């Protein structure tokens, strides 16, 4: 689950990090009132969406008067902001952050943290190349990114934070300020089950103070049950509707940009299914794992969710029966097709527990389903069916 910029900043502020202050506005009039309260002559209007690249997309603008603040806000609210991190539809802008202007600054830095799966530790990343896309820095000049792995038994140690500060070119009082900032960021990361934290830019102002000008936080969705205050911050308008619906039925669904819908049991098999679709020249429209203990109702809902995607031109159902019986899957497929007006080809591959019975049920249903023997055969048939 992602947080909005203003939510991320408030969370970081509660751990002692200095932030760019601002006020949320849901209308042009509220933005004008917020401008009057801004301590700087210039204010920054920031569209609040779950995506990076807002500046280049016109989602971040400087305003010098309350009238300008009202005009810019009215132009942003109600529109969809399209950035390099969104799909073609973009993300809806429901409100903006009216923030104080922090510029000019001495320099812009980058500070981030993730859970590194290879070391199985929280890893901090820092760079002198702040204010730009860190992915671009990692690709073109990886030597400019410093990494620090944190031992979970002892946590972030002061000498590690000081070492990062030295590499960032900080000096004097800035060293202690950065140590406090990085320590607070680590504490926030661990205590709130964060899986992604980015402060970009982390600005060094002309007076030498270090301030978080932007903040991005992603929370581990599996931990929301023990984070009620964080869970309450979820903005469902920024989430994919099909992914939200899938979560209600305990389905692991991720929307992609292809045209072949996939329904599979097991995450590994689901990834293999997407790989082989690509191998045969197709593009998967989604990742969908119905799980090892899928029920008939869940399978029906999974099928309906796939078909709600208007880009889907064909569906591949790939089931390996273990705990899940193939005959139950077959009955669920029939029920879903009868409930939903299916106008696209459907390829079904059943293997394992009661596979023969499942195939028989599908054959006797009278529905126009394409049966496949083996994973390669299934991928070839769905790709051919979509191209036909």
From Swiss-Prot:
Domain ATP-grasp span(s) in chain numbering: 9-245
Cofactor annotation remark: Binds 1 Mg(2+) ion per subunit.
Reaction(s) catalysed by this chain's protein: succinate + ATP + CoA = succinyl-CoA + ADP + phosphate; GTP + succinate + CoA = succinyl-CoA + GDP + phosphate
Enzyme class per UniProt: ligase
UniProt-annotated binding residues for Mg(2+): 200, 214
A cellular component annotation (GO) from this entry: cytosol
Chain positions recorded as substrate binding sites: 265, 322-324
Subunit-level organization: Heterotetramer of two alpha and two beta subunits.
EC number, as in UniProt: 6.2.1.5
Any GO BP: succinyl-CoA metabolic process
Organism: Psychrobacter cryohalolentis (strain ATCC BAA-1226 / DSM 17306 / VKM B-2378 / K5)
HAMAP family in the record: Succ_CoA_beta (MF_00558)
Superkingdom of origin organism: Bacteria
Protein name, per record: Succinate--CoA ligase [ADP-forming] subunit beta
Cofactor requirement: Mg(2+)
Keywords of the record: ATP-binding, Ligase, Magnesium, Metal-binding, Nucleotide-binding, Tricarboxylic acid cycle
Key word Ligase present: yes
């Amino acid at each position: 689950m992602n947080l909005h910029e203003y939510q991320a900043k408030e969370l970081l502020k509660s751990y002692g990090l200095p932030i760019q202050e601002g006020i949320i506005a849901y209308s042009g009039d509220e933005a004008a009132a917020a401008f009057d309260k801004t301590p700087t002559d210039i204010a920054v209007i920031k569209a609040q969406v779950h995506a990076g690249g807002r500046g280049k997309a016109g989602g971040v603008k400087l305003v010098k008067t309350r009238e300008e603040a009202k005009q810019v806000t009215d132009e942003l609210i109600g529109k969809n902001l399209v950035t390099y991190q969104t799909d073609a539809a973009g993300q809806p802008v429901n409100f903006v952050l009216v923030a104080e202007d922090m510029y000019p600054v001495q320099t812009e830095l980058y500070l981030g943290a993730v859970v590194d799966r290879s070391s199985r530790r929280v890893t901090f990343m820092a760079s002198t190349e702040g204010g730009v896309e860190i992915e671009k820095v990692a690709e073109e000049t990886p030597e400019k990114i410093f990494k620090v792995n944190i031992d979970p038994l002892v946590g972030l140690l002061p000498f590690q934070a000081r070492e990062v500060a030295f590499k960032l070119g900080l000096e004097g009082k800035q060293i202690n300020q950065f140590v406090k900032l990085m320590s607070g960021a680590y504490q926030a990361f661990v205590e709130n089950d964060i899986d992604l934290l980015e402060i970009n830019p982390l600005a060094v102002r002309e007076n030498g103070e270090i301030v978080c000008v932007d903040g991005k936080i992603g929370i581990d969705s599996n931990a929301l049950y023990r984070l009620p205050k964080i869970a309450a911050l979820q903005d469902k308008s920024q989430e994919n509707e099909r992914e939200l619906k899938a979560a209600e039925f305990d389905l692991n669904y991720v929307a992609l940009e292809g045209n072949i819908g996939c329904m599979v049991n097991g995450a590994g098999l689901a990834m293999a299914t997407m790989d082989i679709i690509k191998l045969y020249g197709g593009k998967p429209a989604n990742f969908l794992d119905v799980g090892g203990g899928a029920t008939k109702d869940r399978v029906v809902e999974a099928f309906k969710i796939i078909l709600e995607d208007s880009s889907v031109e064909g569906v591949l159902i790939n089931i390996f029966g273990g705990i899940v019986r193939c005959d139950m899957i077959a009955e669920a497929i029939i029920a879903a097709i009868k409930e939903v007006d299916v106008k696209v080809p459907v390829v079904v591959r059943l293997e394992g527990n009661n596979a023969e019975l499942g195939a028989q049920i599908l054959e006797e249903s009278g529905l126009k389903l394409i049966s496949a023997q083996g994973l390669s055969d299934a991928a070839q048939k769905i790709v051919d069916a979509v191209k036909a």
